[in-house]
A protein has these predicted regions:
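Outer-membrane beta-barrel proteins
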Residues: 35-53, 107-114, 167-170, 241-243, ...
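Long C-terminal interaction/binding lobes of large macromolecular proteins
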Residues: 79, 89-91, 105, 118, ...
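Outer-membrane beta-barrel translocator/receptor signature
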Residues: 3-18, 22-30, 34-40, 46-54, ...
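Surface-exposed loop/turn segments flanking beta-strands in extracellular/periplasmic regions
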Residues: 90-101, 147-163, 451-456
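Outer membrane beta-barrel
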Residues: 48-106, 110-143, 258-277, 426-442
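Exposed, low-structure sequence patches enriched in small/polar residues
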Residues: 5-15, 172-205, 212-473
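N-terminal periplasmic/intermembrane-space "pro-region" immediately following the signal or transit peptide
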Residues: 1-3, 129
Length: 473
């Protein structure tokens, strides 16, 4: 182990966390969250303080003109995420009724996420009946790879299980200050957000063909304006933002909501390849608000009694190269069709088909490389059934098929069953789940939602062949 310190975890292989929360009415929230990932030391070795991650927060609401006051760890999100967004989102697979919802301002950070939060103070002040002004400041240590006084990359997973992971812990600092001015009118909502953040060392990733336009430098600032207009059953919403170099990103959406729960959405987005915002996150095919344009159209409606149809098509284009895509100017398509059946409150089932086509690098048998379309097809059947609010059952059957054009396909199957039972006479809930999976390789892996301890969940991926079971109390 001394010769090869990165081949064995420094701690035991169990995961656990501790949460304490207190709230008084809807005005005061306070709490602490502590977490140790599997493999991290606990009160030993490199970690003498017990848990690897601690999060303390205090949130006060509706005290005079102060709508929200946050101390300690908190989250902020404004507009539609082109400037700053620390929310967890389901992206394009969210229901159309929630897709494009405006972000929620200042909130407490009570989760175990070790990256998407800020540390300091944030306040929301009610200037007038329809006007609100927010301000926030953060100073925090962050994980990353620092080499020759440059920050080569930010480490976002929060793992500190090996020596090489501990070497990246708290190696840099980031300060952030920002504000948001919001108007909430009868027929419109308007917002203006400005954020400035600075690292203690310049951010300078090692240059690759795909990261030429990644954020570089010591300081960054962004300004964005968001809007939402209402007229009868129509709403027009969006946001436009610029960075310190004058490069811009914009997202605009038209929503039509007639009677009967129908939603029709048309959305256009343009994220310049050179746009830089460290904390931006919005709707898109990529994971960053950069190097993407697209057109999205979606429909959610009832076609028969108890049967609802959801479908969308997203056409996207990447003007510059991406990771594992060495060709500039690639494009793709993401389409979904889902039929849901819910005759009663206790029973719901749906079947979903998703098709995605995008260009990726492929190495042929003769070692020649080319960028060709990769096609992924997914099918899911899910049944949810509850009995008198005591027992909840969920059955899932998944299938995935992925292949490059003209090449053999990789297939994957997964079947899972979960059950949750609530004891009404005791403050106790029992959750059981089991899954069987069989895939050809890692490319055809399958992911499912899995409940964890209270207020926590995970989304593990499964590949090759095996079974998994879990039990939570």
């Amino acid at each position: 182990l001394k010769k090869n310190p990165n081949k064995q975890y420094l701690g035991y292989g169990y995961y656990h966390n501790l949460r304490y929360s207190f709230h008084y009415r809807d005005q005061i929230y306070a709490g602490i969250t502590a977490e140790k990932d599997a493999g991290e030391p606990f009160f030993t070795g490199q970690n003498k303080k017990g848990y690897d991650f601690y999060s303390l927060y205090l949130l006060i609401r509706n005290i005079g003109h102060i709508k929200t006051l946050a101390l300690g760890n908190y989250r902020v999100s404004y507009g539609y995420g082109l400037v700053i967004n620390t929310d967890f989102g389901m992206g394009k697979t969210a229901t159309l009724s929630t897709l494009g919802n405006k972000s929620r301002g200042i909130r407490k950070h009570s989760s175990t996420d070790e990256y998407n939060y800020f540390q300091g103070m944030a306040v929301s002040y009610k200037l007038a009946k329809r006007w609100t002004l927010d301000g926030f400041y953060s100073y925090r240590k962050m994980d990353g790879i620092v080499d020759n006084q440059f920050i080569r990359s930010l480490k976002k997973d929060g793992y500190h299980r090996l020596y090489r992971e501990f070497e990246k812990k708290n190696t840099l600092t980031n300060q952030l200050v920002g504000s948001n001015l919001n108007y909430n009118g009868k027929y419109c909502e308007l917002g203006l957000t400005a954020v400035y953040n600075v690292f203690n060392k310049p951010l300078n990733p090692e240059k690759k063909y795909y990261n030429i336009y990644y954020p570089r430098g010591k300081d960054f600032y962004n300004v964005g304006g968001d809007y939402k207009f209402f007229w009868k059953r129509f709403s027009l919403l969006g946001e436009t933002a610029i960075d310190k170099c004058g490069t811009w990103a914009t997202m605009n959406m038209l929503r039509y909501s007639p009677k009967g729960g129908t939603q029709l959405i048309v959305m256009n987005r343009y994220y310049d390849a050179k746009y830089q915002s460290v904390y931006a996150r919005s709707i898109g095919e990529g994971s960053t608000v950069q190097n993407e344009s697209g057109f999205y159209i979606g429909l959610e409606t009832s076609i028969l009694k108890y049967i609802k149809m959801t479908c969308y098509g997203d056409f996207f284009y990447f003007p510059w190269k991406k990771y594992l895509v060495s060709k500039a100017g690639t494009k793709g398509l993401d389409g979904l069709l889902q039929l849901s059946y819910s005759p009663t409150y206790e029973l719901e089932m749906f079947i979903r088909y998703r098709y995605k086509k995008k260009e990726k690098d492929f190495t042929a048998a003769d070692k020649t490389k080319q960028t060709i379309p990769s096609i992924q097809q997914k099918c899911r059947y899910q049944l949810n059934y509850s009995v008198k609010d005591k027992l909840t059952l969920k059955t899932i059957a998944d299938y995935v098929r992925i292949n490059f054009r003209g090449q053999s396909a990789s297939n994957g199957f997964l079947v899972s069953q979960s059950a949750a039972y609530t004891f009404h006479l005791l403050p106790l809930q029992l959750d059981l789940s089991a899954a069987w999976f069989n895939t050809d390789d890692y490319n055809s892996r399958l992911t499912i939602y899995e409940k964890s301890v209270l207020y926590a969940f995970s989304m593990p991926s499964f590949y090759y062949k095996g079974m998994r079971r879990s039990e939570e109390r």
